[in-house]
Amino acid sequence: HVLDEKSERLLSYFSRLSGTPGSVYNQLSTADIKFGSITLSTGDEVQISEGEAGRIFATSRNHEDRKAAFIERNSTYNDNINTYAASYDGICQRDWAYAQARNYSSTLEATLENDNIPVDVYLNLLEQGRAGTAPLQRYHKLRKEALKLEEYDGYDSAIPVIDFDKNYDYDAVAKMVKNSIKPL
């Protein structure tokens, strides 16, 4: 799908522009994003960020705390939903234009060709993934039961089933690692 020299040169003029939608997304989702704060069940006020929300999802035994962190984090993204959508549309339009210019039948074919993956292989992977969700659904059902939750949401999937809350300092861990490899 390589074009003649004149056409390749013409396409190269657009290469800097092609990164604009991704750049807009990155600036909006990192530099310009302003998360709010929540009050946890302990009474502590916490400033939400991606990292803090992840910490709450993975460590808070309180379902309502995890839910509040999820809602606050997602509402921040929802506040800019149209800008995110426009950025994604720009990415789709860019990929479509390049696929058309290089005579691909679809953007999927153009994207997969870089890794030499046939479209049929990719579509089969999706089909098999969809067909094989029953074990994952069962796993989450068992987690819900083990955690004794009335409702189970995505933000409940990171909390350990076993209530184990022990922290180790660096020196203690270093000593344990050294002791564990002594026999080697």
Whereabouts are the PLM-identified features?
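His/Asp/Glu-rich acidic catalytic environments and adjacent acidic regulatory segments
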Residues: 1-120, 124, 128, 171, ...
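A conserved glycine-rich
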Residues: 118, 140-184
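Long, non-coiled-coil amphipathic alpha-helical linker/lever segments
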Residues: 123-138, 155
